[in-house]
Amino acid sequence: YELASALSQKQFPKALAIINSLFSTDFYAPLMISAFFRHYWALFRIRRFAEANPQVVKTFLSSRGYKDPAVDGAAYEIGLASGLLQEGEQRKIYPVIIASGIVQAARKFSDEELKTVLRWLLEFDAGVKTGKIEATEHEVQLFCFRIARVSELIRSGTDI
Protein backbone atom coordinates (compact mmCIF):
# COMPACT_ATOMS: atom_id res chain seq x y z
CA TYR A 1 0.00 0.00 0.00
CA GLU A 2 2.78 2.46 0.87
CA LEU A 3 4.37 2.01 -2.54
CA ALA A 4 1.10 2.58 -4.42
CA SER A 5 0.42 5.60 -2.24
CA ALA A 6 3.88 7.08 -2.88
CA LEU A 7 3.40 6.63 -6.62
CA SER A 8 -0.08 8.14 -6.58
CA GLN A 9 1.43 11.15 -4.79
CA LYS A 10 4.10 11.12 -7.55
CA GLN A 11 6.89 10.77 -4.96
CA PHE A 12 9.34 8.64 -6.93
CA PRO A 13 12.30 8.92 -4.51
CA LYS A 14 10.10 7.60 -1.70
CA ALA A 15 8.86 4.84 -4.02
CA LEU A 16 12.47 3.82 -4.79
CA ALA A 17 13.25 3.52 -1.08
CA ILE A 18 10.18 1.32 -0.60
CA ILE A 19 11.12 -0.85 -3.61
CA ASN A 20 14.64 -1.31 -2.22
CA SER A 21 13.14 -2.32 1.11
CA LEU A 22 10.74 -4.77 -0.54
CA PHE A 23 13.50 -6.48 -2.49
CA SER A 24 15.48 -7.02 0.71
CA THR A 25 12.64 -9.32 1.83
CA ASP A 26 10.78 -12.20 0.21
CA PHE A 27 9.06 -9.89 -2.26
CA TYR A 28 6.50 -11.37 -4.65
CA ALA A 29 5.81 -9.06 -7.61
CA PRO A 30 2.32 -10.36 -8.50
CA LEU A 31 1.09 -9.24 -5.06
CA MET A 32 2.46 -5.76 -5.74
CA ILE A 33 0.72 -5.66 -9.11
CA SER A 34 -2.54 -6.72 -7.49
CA ALA A 35 -2.22 -4.01 -4.82
CA PHE A 36 -1.41 -1.41 -7.47
CA PHE A 37 -4.35 -2.43 -9.58
CA ARG A 38 -6.73 -2.18 -6.61
CA HIS A 39 -5.32 1.24 -5.69
CA TYR A 40 -5.46 2.76 -9.18
CA TRP A 41 -8.86 1.22 -9.90
CA ALA A 42 -10.11 2.86 -6.67
CA LEU A 43 -8.64 6.20 -7.82
CA PHE A 44 -10.47 5.84 -11.13
CA ARG A 45 -13.75 4.96 -9.40
CA ILE A 46 -13.37 7.92 -7.03
CA ARG A 47 -12.98 10.22 -10.04
CA ARG A 48 -16.13 8.75 -11.62
CA PHE A 49 -18.01 9.14 -8.33
CA ALA A 50 -16.80 12.75 -7.98
CA GLU A 51 -18.05 13.55 -11.47
CA ALA A 52 -21.51 12.14 -10.69
CA ASN A 53 -21.65 13.41 -7.07
CA PRO A 54 -19.61 16.62 -6.87
CA GLN A 55 -21.39 17.86 -3.75
CA VAL A 56 -20.46 14.76 -1.75
CA VAL A 57 -16.79 15.14 -2.64
CA LYS A 58 -16.94 18.88 -1.98
CA THR A 59 -18.35 18.18 1.50
CA PHE A 60 -15.56 15.70 2.12
CA LEU A 61 -12.78 18.00 0.92
CA SER A 62 -14.06 21.18 2.58
CA SER A 63 -14.11 19.86 6.13
CA ARG A 64 -11.27 20.59 8.49
CA GLY A 65 -12.47 18.55 11.43
CA TYR A 66 -12.21 14.94 12.42
CA LYS A 67 -15.38 13.15 13.53
CA ASP A 68 -17.61 15.50 11.55
CA PRO A 69 -20.76 13.48 10.73
CA ALA A 70 -21.08 15.14 7.30
CA VAL A 71 -17.50 14.23 6.41
CA ASP A 72 -17.89 10.70 7.75
CA GLY A 73 -21.03 10.29 5.63
CA ALA A 74 -19.32 11.63 2.52
CA ALA A 75 -16.23 9.47 3.17
CA TYR A 76 -18.43 6.41 3.60
CA GLU A 77 -20.19 7.09 0.28
CA ILE A 78 -16.83 7.56 -1.44
CA GLY A 79 -15.48 4.39 0.16
CA LEU A 80 -18.46 2.34 -1.02
CA ALA A 81 -18.30 3.78 -4.55
CA SER A 82 -14.56 3.11 -4.83
CA GLY A 83 -14.82 -0.45 -3.56
CA LEU A 84 -12.52 0.32 -0.64
CA LEU A 85 -15.30 -0.11 1.93
CA GLN A 86 -18.14 -2.59 2.16
CA GLU A 87 -21.58 -2.05 3.69
CA GLY A 88 -21.30 -1.69 7.45
CA GLU A 89 -17.61 -0.75 7.53
CA GLN A 90 -18.09 2.76 8.92
CA ARG A 91 -15.35 2.23 11.49
CA LYS A 92 -12.80 1.94 8.68
CA ILE A 93 -13.61 5.39 7.26
CA TYR A 94 -10.75 7.19 8.97
CA PRO A 95 -7.83 4.91 8.05
CA VAL A 96 -9.04 3.87 4.60
CA ILE A 97 -10.50 7.09 3.20
CA ILE A 98 -9.59 10.10 5.35
CA ALA A 99 -6.04 9.40 6.60
CA SER A 100 -4.91 7.71 3.39
CA GLY A 101 -5.50 10.84 1.30
CA ILE A 102 -6.88 8.72 -1.52
CA VAL A 103 -9.52 11.27 -2.54
CA GLN A 104 -6.86 13.95 -2.88
CA ALA A 105 -4.66 11.51 -4.81
CA ALA A 106 -7.50 10.81 -7.26
CA ARG A 107 -7.63 14.51 -8.06
CA LYS A 108 -3.96 14.46 -9.15
CA PHE A 109 -4.69 12.21 -12.13
CA SER A 110 -6.74 12.65 -15.27
CA ASP A 111 -8.95 9.84 -16.52
CA GLU A 112 -6.51 9.29 -19.38
CA GLU A 113 -3.59 8.94 -16.96
CA LEU A 114 -5.45 6.42 -14.80
CA LYS A 115 -6.56 4.41 -17.84
CA THR A 116 -2.95 4.38 -19.05
CA VAL A 117 -1.65 3.20 -15.67
CA LEU A 118 -4.31 0.48 -15.53
CA ARG A 119 -3.34 -0.66 -19.04
CA TRP A 120 0.35 -0.72 -18.05
CA LEU A 121 -0.54 -2.76 -14.97
CA LEU A 122 -2.37 -5.33 -17.08
CA GLU A 123 0.56 -5.52 -19.51
CA PHE A 124 3.12 -5.82 -16.70
CA ASP A 125 1.02 -8.46 -14.93
CA ALA A 126 0.64 -10.51 -18.11
CA GLY A 127 4.35 -10.13 -18.86
CA VAL A 128 5.37 -11.34 -15.41
CA LYS A 129 2.92 -14.24 -15.44
CA THR A 130 3.94 -15.42 -18.91
CA GLY A 131 7.66 -15.00 -18.26
CA LYS A 132 8.11 -12.22 -20.84
CA ILE A 133 9.04 -9.82 -18.03
CA GLU A 134 11.22 -10.83 -15.12
CA ALA A 135 10.12 -8.93 -12.03
CA THR A 136 13.62 -7.92 -10.99
CA GLU A 137 14.25 -4.90 -8.80
CA HIS A 138 15.36 -2.96 -11.88
CA GLU A 139 12.20 -3.85 -13.87
CA VAL A 140 9.96 -2.90 -10.94
CA GLN A 141 11.84 0.41 -10.55
CA LEU A 142 11.39 1.19 -14.25
CA PHE A 143 7.73 0.27 -14.10
CA CYS A 144 7.19 2.48 -11.05
CA PHE A 145 9.06 5.33 -12.77
CA ARG A 146 6.56 5.13 -15.64
CA ILE A 147 3.66 5.32 -13.20
CA ALA A 148 5.16 8.26 -11.31
CA ARG A 149 5.77 10.10 -14.59
CA VAL A 150 2.59 9.13 -16.44
CA SER A 151 1.58 12.78 -16.98
CA GLU A 152 4.85 13.69 -18.66
CA LEU A 153 4.92 10.48 -20.71
CA ILE A 154 1.42 11.08 -22.07
CA ARG A 155 2.17 14.72 -22.89
CA SER A 156 5.35 13.80 -24.75
CA GLY A 157 3.77 10.78 -26.47
CA THR A 158 6.59 8.64 -25.10
CA ASP A 159 6.15 5.07 -23.93
CA ILE A 160 2.37 4.85 -24.14
Residue ranges and their predicted role:
Residues 2, 6, 14-160:
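C-terminal alpha-helical interaction modules of replication/initiation AAA+ assemblies
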